[in-house]
Amino acid sequence: MLNELLEVAARASNTGNMQLYSVVITRDKANKEKLAPAHFNQPMITAAPVVLTFCADANRFVKWAELRDAVAGFDNFQTFIASTIDAMLFAQSFCTAAEEKGLGICYLGTTAYNADKIIDALSLPRLVVPIVTVTVGYPDGMPEQVERLPLGAVVHQEVYTDYTPASIDALYHDKEELEVNKQFVRENDKETLAQVFTDVRYTKANNEYFSDVLLKVLKGQGFL
């Protein structure tokens, strides 16, 4: 079934039909254990039967161009952005197809934090950068859907309408009033839900540190 789902995902839109992406499939227990530290040892890496690492990949296209006497100017940030978009479209198309077949998936954003370690673990060559990891398996049950902001929070008509304090209050009201989120605030000894995100989960110091790591990765992999 995995190849069938990947075939469906490969029909996703992409930049110039160049398909500047690739995916590394990890099933082997030892290889999953090698990946786990890069994902802060989150248990789904070793517990899931399949781990997929979706990559921005200009390597394959550049090698094809070289073999056909074409000069590909793809060692730049623009190509990294294009290939990142391609990889994410491929990944999301896969996830949609997988869930339609009754599979469970989990996105792992830790891929971007420790891209350097994942590059080593997966032997990724120049012009290939891991973007997102997805674990796949059959769920034990059907979990409740995680809350989302109302559509009005993300949709703008004709032009972008900036948010006022009143509109922010209205858009985040239901999210802040959920008991699970109130518990989240209490457990982290914070005053507001926003503080949990800014002071605990996604701190300025961590954002800056991992930004430096990713910039070094892009330079090392030939995109900067």
Predicted regions and their residues:
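Acidic, surface-exposed loops and disordered segments
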Residues: 1-224
